[in-house]
Every structure is written in structure tokens, then in C-alpha cells.
Amino acid sequence: MDHNVFSQFAYKHPGRINVARDVIAFDMMLDHSCLDIWGILQTPDWYPRFFRGLGSCEQVSGNAQEFEVRVSTPRGAVVVHEMRQTLRESSMLMWFHATQVSHCFVSIRLTPEEGGTRIAVRIFGVGLLHPDLAKTGDGAVRNWVREGLLRISDYLEGKQSSLLVNMGDGHSLLLSVAKTMLVSGVVRASRPDRGLRQLNSLAKWGFTLAGGLGAAAARSPHNIASVDRYGTSTYADVAERTACIASGLAAGGFTSDSTFAVLARNHAAMVECMVAASKLGADLVLLNTGLAARAIEEIIKHNAVDAIFVDDDLDPQVRYLPAEVPRISTHPNSILPQRGSIDDLISAGPGAPPVAPPRQPGKLIVLTSGTTGTPKGARRPTPPGFGAVAAMLSRMPLRRDEVMLLCAPLFHAWGLAALQVSTPLVATVVLMERFDAEECLKTVALQRCTVLILVPVMLQRILELPADVVGRYDTSSLRVVASSGSPISGASVIKFMDTFGDILYNFYGSTEVSWATVADPTDLRLAPTTAGRPPLGTRIAILGQDGNPLPVGAVGRIFVGNDMLFDGYTNAASPAVEDQLMDTGDLGYLDASGRLFIAGRDDEMIISGGENVFPRPVEEAIAALPQVADVAVVGVPDPEFGQRLAAFVVRAPAASLDEEMIKDYVRNRLSRFSIPRDVTFVDQLPRTATGKVLKRRLTDGQFPLETGWPG
């Protein structure tokens, strides 16, 4: 036992040491220098990268030698540890203890020896340091610490270990897919007749929107397929209407070689346009409703669009289109003069020959967010089978006959993915045209929704509602709330689950790679900022500049492999692909438990005074302040340091907050080079229609410093 350490602790904390308690003591050697190992051990927020089962580790107060660290646990509890560091000529010593309880203490001493470093670990009262350690024996605790220290060694050595593959139960991916389909109710062994009709439709139309809708209609024709402000439609209704729309389009001279576009909000008619184009085998461009008229003109021209479906109130955004591009109204009775509608196509459909299944499925073209410039058109692939559905269901427990409130825009990859998974589940999709936080909760209560699909900015708007407003609505029917599209702050994750229960799922992916990882409630309770783990049939790798995997814990480029990698852009070169893994353009790392964390976009990394700084940890730190409603951190030019950090902050209503308070708060939690030099208070941040912050707008010189962005 290290008696000097024991004596120091006993002197400072009299009465806390019970010598009769068990003590875990062991030494081990690592083939690395004391300074290299010490550099990691003195950085508490890195501990989850190497030690399994740890959530966030955040410094909350103190200085470089003595400070407090807050550690989250799987049950959401927080343990605060006091840490102290001592540097001597012959060794380096670190010790810490839980401040809320007595009789617990850990010391780690590093001593240089020939060929490496001897690490002496002494643990007193292990079960009081972390609640999960109380359930294990001394041998398991000793192995846990050893494994963590060995991962630090692997990190320093550069071991190529940042590669994750989810192949299910390990025996067969196909068997895992089949099991997932049975558990979710997509396939039922008890009704082979309905299953046969379902498979016949998929054989006819493929795993497309047309095939999914047709399979659901063949299996459960009288189930409600959609609900919007105009009414309800059964699966049989939608199948019949979309067949007529497709026939009407064919009668008008459109073919599988045609390309359509749709500019619409979430409603049943938009879904019908999408399914009808799928039945015809035509390509369909999903237009963001937030695009300017000139941008839409450019996209229509580039994609050689033959006709466009458009909501009447969005007509000003298509005013620059050539007259030879027909506009088809999505509204039953268009108020616009000489404007045909999808109801006109439905009326013409019964007299036209039915549309035969196309030889090749049409492509859905989804636009990227355009946060770094002009949106790119991404060709979405046709799912090769049930694997795409099984991937989502393997990490999110959706079941047959769900009632799904779809708030995420259908023109966005996330909204589209939710629609695609709804038909195998024969779910009822409730469509919200314009998002309003209170109206969302009201709809959940009225429709008894079991699933809510949204993007993070919508989740944030719900959290901003007063408690008495939230309390008016019974949301107990919700089992799953799924968010995707941009990061959610850790503070918002915890607040949402504390308010609505542990039902939050956070999807990470992109238009190009579809899904990559999913964080379930267990992940989020332990590590609120995690992007989660890969779903079934998915590979994740963190690669370095040489294209090889990096060690666990190291930040590198995130590459993803699955069955739904996109088929390329319509107007740009495709991202890099390494060994069937596609570059997401994001940087991140894997922790010891196999969870992914996003550091930021490759082009967001800030180099200040030679130090690499990512905005996300700084944003997370500032967002934890209750006086902060929203925040974005960017890099701006600096004549001395090359770049410096600038924070744009939205105050919470009636909050008192100034620049120095924010700097002091960050100073106590992150390294000195993570402190923003500039803090600007604004009314709101510029965002895309799906909620992503337009950071380039913050640095292009047109930002109004005093009044923020107009609402």
C-alpha cells in the first residue's frame, strides 16, 4: 500500500478511513513515458474514452492542481469527485474521492522506470466511488482499471481499433434481420395469406414507396394510413388514389423517363405525389420549402424537371420557372387560375390504362442542407430488402400499428426515412404541415400518438414551453420520440427525458449515408452528447489521414458503411469511399463502450495558437447554463493566433447574463484555449428549415451585432 498517500488523505479527512475495509492494490507497467500517460490522466473528460461504463466526466470547479469533476452514471445520477494532482521529481501522483460520502479514495502514482512507466493503483471503498462498481468483485474492478489503462496505452501506441460492425447476434445477418422483422410485427407467422399478399406487392413494385404502400394495403387495407387537417385516408384509399394519379400522369405523356419535383409541406397529398411518381418509375426531386425562388429555378433547370407538384401558398417560390414546366397543385381545389391539381389527375385516372410496374425504380433526389453553400442533390438508393427497415428497428423499438406524428419535413432525409419505415409497420402517420410546439403536444394527446418524429430545433421549442402549458396535455401515449438532423445539447437531452420520460432516441446520419448510429435512452442518460451505436448491418470507422483506423478515443474522420449509401450527387463529386465505407465529412471518436461522439465538421475545426479546438464541446459547456437558450461557436480570423473562438448566444427569457459570466463558466470546465475571446448576444441564430445553424452567416460580415436575426 502507498502509505504516504494514505496518510495524506487520513490527515486531511479525519474519520473517513476505515482500515477494516477492503483495499484494491496493484501495479502494472506501460511502455510509454510518464508525461504521455499523465497528459491523459489529468484530463477527466477523456476518461470515458478509455474506461467502460463511464458517462460524461466534466470539470466543474477548481484549478489545474485541485478541482471537482462531475461523473454521470447509468441511472442518471451524478457523483462529484474531488481530484488532486502532485508532481514530484521522482513520480507523479493523482488522487480523488467522492465528495458526498466518506471512506472512499483512489490514488494513481506514475513512476518512470527503464522501458516505460510503473503505475501503482490503490483503491479504498470502491463501491462508494461509482454505484456500478458496488455490484462487482475486487477482481472485476481490478480488470476494469487495467483494461482502461491498456486502452490508454493503445491510444499512445496508435493501435488501429476504431472500427465497429453490428452484424446482429453474430451468427447470420439475415437471421438477425428476420428476427427483427418478427419482433416488430412487420412479418407475422400467424397469417401466411396476408404475408403472401405483402410479398407479392413488394415483388411487383420493389422496396420503394409504391411497394411499401402496396404491401400495407394488401395486408391491412382498412387501417388508417394518414391523418392531416383535411381528414383521414385508409391504406386502400391511398393505394387507389395513387394508382389514379400515376395513370393520369401517364395519360398526360409522362413516363418512367420523366423527372418530377415537389414543393410542399407535410400533408397527405404530398405523400400521394411521392407514391404516384414511384409507381410511374419517375425520378422525384424533394424541394426544401425554405429555398428562394432563384435557387429553385436553378435546381429545376439542373435536374431537367418535367413538372412540379406545388402547394398553392408556395407558388411565389416557383414564379421564375419556365412556362413549359407544368405546375400541378397539391390542393383539391386550387385557387390559382388555370392550375391543374392532383384531384384532376385522379378524375382522369380511372379512364386511363393502369400503370405497369417500371423496369427500373425511379430515384428520390433529396437536397443536402446547404449549410456550407449551395444545396446538392443526393440520389437516394432503393432499399435492397428488409435490411434497411431492420436497421432502424434494431435500435428503435417501433411496432406494428404505431400512431406516428411526423413533424420532421418530408423533403428532409429524416422525414423521408420515417415515412419509409411507416408502411412495413402499417402505421398511421399523422402529418403536421407547420410546426408549433403546443399544437404538437395537443395533437399527441388528441390522436394518442405513440411515436413522435422531429428535428432538434422542434424538440428545443417544446422545452421552451411553460410548464403549465406542457401540463395541459396528456402525452403518456408516447413510447418513442426520435430526433435527427443536427446535434442536441446534452442539457436539452436530460431536460427532455426528465420531463417526458426516457423515450428519446437520437439518430446520427446524413443524406449521403442514411443512418450511422442511434443513441437510445440508456446511452443518453449516461452520455447525453453521444451519437450512439451502429444499428444492424452497419459499419463505423474512425480513419486517419492515411485511410487507416485510429485508436479508440482518437478523433478522426467518420466513415460509414451500410446498404443505403447514396448513389451520388446530381451536381457535385461524391465523397471519398474507403473499403465500402463513405466519408461523412464529420470528425469524431469512439469511446471504450463503443459509442460514437461527434467533434464537428472537418471544416469547423478551429486552429487557435497552434491548438485544435472543436466548437461542439464549447457549445455544450455554454448551453449547460440555464440562462442560455441557444448558442453557436465559430472561428474568426485573428492576427495573433490565426483564429479565435467567437460565441453567439441567445439569452433565455428574462435571463441576466454577460460576456464575463460565459467566459468564467467555460474557463472552469474546459482548457484555456477553449474560452471564446468574443461573445455576442443575439435574438436568435440563423437556421435552415430543418434547424441546422447557418454558421457561415455568422462570419460573413453581414451579421447585425446588436439586434440579432429578425424572427
Residue ranges of predicted features:
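Conserved AMP-binding/adenylation subdomain of ANL enzymes
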Residues: 386-403, 411-451, 465
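Conserved ATP/PPi-binding loop(s) of AMP-dependent carboxylate-activating enzymes
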Residues: 534-537, 545-579, 611-613
